[in-house]
């Protein structure tokens, strides 16, 4: 046993000895029980835990001396299971593998044992995420999704000279192919897959983000006897996503990209059987310029991070904190809402704060039948019959090709590409946009769906031309909309609810205010004033839902401090003002409760 092994044993021994001594401080630790719900569907031997120790504690100091890349064999025991220290993360948490663990009940026992150590800040299962796409008819059609009636109108922006030039977008996905329509727009990336069997390239983390294929044989990835988990061919998912964002254009070959003047950083986090939460968030953070121990720093920080991936359950502690760190670096994080035809609050990372969650639409401007929906979806983009870059290989790469896919995975890169177009337009006039400003522009300049949708997909379909007009201050050139009543900007009419609503663990609650004496449809400056009493506001997601069903995320600082109290002012355009406005608050973790004490709207 080398020194690293000895130190690793000492770190986990603190956990075990605390449990034996009866020093139960679980109330001070966050235990994410929900993260264990899908363990029975994972491949055998794949269960890992993320353990974050409180800063300055002996356990935290012990982790700081660990290697981030080398898996260390050891004989550690936790609740009767052998555990192996894997590495530390960009958050400073430790990853521990428990190969013999098989059930949710066993995972709860292990987490409770770990949480009994007073040094522990939170513990959760290192969940697996998967690409959010499904194969579709590979025959060639027009790329309607760029310029059709319900496309993103990228062609109108290209005609004005904005192509995403000078902007860097990272694609956190399955890696990248050697492809004639991609190579010219690729920057150096990295492979963050820490599991050698999943990586398929003979090692773990390295500087080669090449896609080795994510194919698998019958039930290699768990889920027996579910026929959906039978063998699958390689998806070339990351390359399809990258091609939508920035395929080389005007080269007489293949397809175009939304922001073909931008550059892409490929970050490989998904391999055979998906990828771990901890690898995904490390890759995300690194791509935006964050430092990860054991990995060379990225010299081309991304302004937009595309993550067309996800898994079941609410946002994890690890995901939310790494998302916040990435956003603080100045990157907008664009997420696929998911393909389960369910409320997006039930999947991650679309259920996290500080992300832009994207649903999928059809060529007719309707919700794609597979697309997730609900208050967590901020806007939509084309997600069916999307033509982009792939390979003909069913296992490993064989020859460059093109094919159509469907999914919210295909919708998200349209938004990432449009975000790059908007940033390049802002750069042309010396304007710098924060992630929240960029998100706001994309959400409030969307074009309309084709009639009323069966389920909510946010504000509308992303509109590149209208978004660029907004950042340039040329609203008169935005895409026309139906006539609306004149703007309302009185600023002196207050609507208030003093009905107290309890906030309980892992649930969403709502409170409504009825507005009857404003224009039916119009534009307004609205001040939302909140009085939410809660012990840890980092665990809350807050949204305001208009009578039309449009969702306005209410961003707060995300700090681990109590209460959300005070005003937030924002503008709405062509919005339905009459009807019931709904405040929705979602509790994302166990251990803390509170209440909506009151809230008000001022028009």
Swiss-Prot record:
Residues 1-21 form the signal peptide. Residues 143-468 form the Peptidase S8 domain. GO terms for cellular component: extracellular region. The keyword Secreted applies. Its main location: secreted. It is found in: Secreted. Residues 22-132, 477-603 form a propeptide. Disulfide bonds join 221-273, 315-352. The active site is at 173 (charge relay system), 237 (charge relay system), 409 (charge relay system). Residues 478-603 form the P/Homo B domain. Keywords: Disulfide bond, Hydrolase, Protease, Secreted, Serine protease, Signal, Zymogen. Its EC number is 3.4.21.-. GO terms for biological process: proteolysis. GO terms for molecular function: serine-type endopeptidase activity. Pfam families: P_proprotein, Peptidase_S8. Residues 197-221 are annotated as: Disordered. Belongs to the peptidase S8 family. This is Extracellular basic protease. The lineage of its organism: Bacteria, Pseudomonadati, Pseudomonadota, Gammaproteobacteria, Cardiobacteriales.
């Amino acid at each position: 046993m080398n020194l690293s092994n000895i130190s690793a044993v000492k770190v986990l021994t603190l956990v075990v000895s605390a449990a034996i001594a009866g020093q139960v401080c679980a109330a001070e630790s966050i235990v994410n029980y929900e993260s264990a719900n899908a363990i029975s569907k994972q491949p055998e031997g794949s269960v890992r835990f993320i353990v974050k120790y409180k800063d300055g504690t002996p356990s935290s100091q012990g982790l700081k001396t660990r290697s981030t890349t080398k898996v260390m064999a050891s004989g550690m025991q936790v609740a009767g299971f052998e555990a192996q220290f894997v590495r530390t993360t960009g958050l400073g948490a430790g990853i521990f593998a428990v190969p013999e663990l098989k059930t949710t009940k066993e995972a709860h026992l292990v987490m409770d044992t770990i949480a009994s150590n007073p040094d522990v800040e939170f513990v959760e299962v290192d969940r697996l995420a998967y690409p959010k796409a499904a194969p579709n008819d590979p025959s060639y059609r027009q790329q309607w999704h760029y310029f059709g009636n319900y496309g993103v109108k990228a062609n109108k922006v290209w005609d004005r000279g904005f192509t995403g030039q000078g902007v860097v977008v990272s694609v956190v996905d399955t890696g990248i192919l050697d492809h004639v329509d991609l190579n010219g727009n690729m920057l150096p990336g990295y492979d963050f897959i820490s599991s050698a069997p999943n990586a398929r390239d003979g090692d773990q983390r390295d500087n080669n983000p090449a896609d080795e294929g994510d194919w698998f044989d019958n039930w290699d990835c768990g889920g027996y006897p579910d026929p959906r988990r039978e063998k699958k061919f390689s998806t070339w998912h990351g390359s399809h996503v990258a091609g939508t964002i920035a395929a080389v254009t005007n080269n007489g070959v293949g397809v175009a990209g939304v922001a073909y003047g931008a550059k892409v950083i490929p970050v490989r986090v998904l391999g055979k059987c998906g990828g771990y939460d901890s690898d995904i968030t490390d890759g995300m953070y690194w791509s935006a310029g964050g430092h990860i121990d054991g990995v060379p720093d990225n010299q081309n920080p991304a302004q937009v991070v595309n993550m067309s991936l996800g898994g079941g359950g609410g946002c994890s502690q690890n995901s939310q904190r790494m998302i916040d760190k990435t956003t603080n670096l100045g990157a907008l994080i664009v997420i696929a809402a998911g393909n389960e035809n369910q409320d997006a609050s039930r999947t991650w990372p679309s259920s996290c704060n500080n992300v832009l969650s994207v649903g999928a639409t059809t060529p007719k401007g309707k919700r794609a039948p597979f697309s997730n929906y609900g208050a967590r979806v901020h806007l939509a983009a084309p997600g069916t019959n999307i033509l982009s870059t792939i390979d003909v290989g069913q296992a490993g790469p064989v020859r460059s090709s093109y094919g159509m896919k469907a999914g919210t995975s295909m919708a998200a890169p349209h938004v990432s590409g449009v975000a790059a177009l908007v940033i390049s337009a802002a750069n042309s006039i010396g304007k710098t946009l924060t992630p929240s400003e960029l998100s706001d522009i994309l959400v409030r300049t969307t074009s309309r769906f084709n009639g009323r949708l069966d389920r909510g997909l946010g504000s509308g379909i992303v509109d590149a031309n209208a978004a660029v007009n907004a950042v340039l201050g040329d609203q008169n050139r935005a895409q026309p909309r139906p006539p609306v009543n004149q703007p309302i900007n009185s600023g002196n009419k207050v609507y208030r609810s003093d009905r107290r609503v309890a906030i309980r663990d892992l649930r969403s609650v709502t409170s409504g205010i009825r507005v009857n004496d404003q224009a039916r449809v119009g534009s307004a400056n609205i001040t939302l004033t909140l009085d939410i009493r809660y012990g840890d506001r980092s665990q809350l997601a807050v949204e305001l839902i208009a009578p039309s069903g449009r969702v306005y995320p209410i961003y707060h600082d995300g700090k681990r401090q109590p209460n959300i109290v005070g005003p937030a002012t924002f503008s709405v355009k062509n919005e339905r003002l009459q009807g019931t406005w709904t405040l929705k608050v979602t509790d994302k973790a166990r251990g803390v409760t509170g209440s909506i004490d009151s809230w008000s709207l001022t028009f």
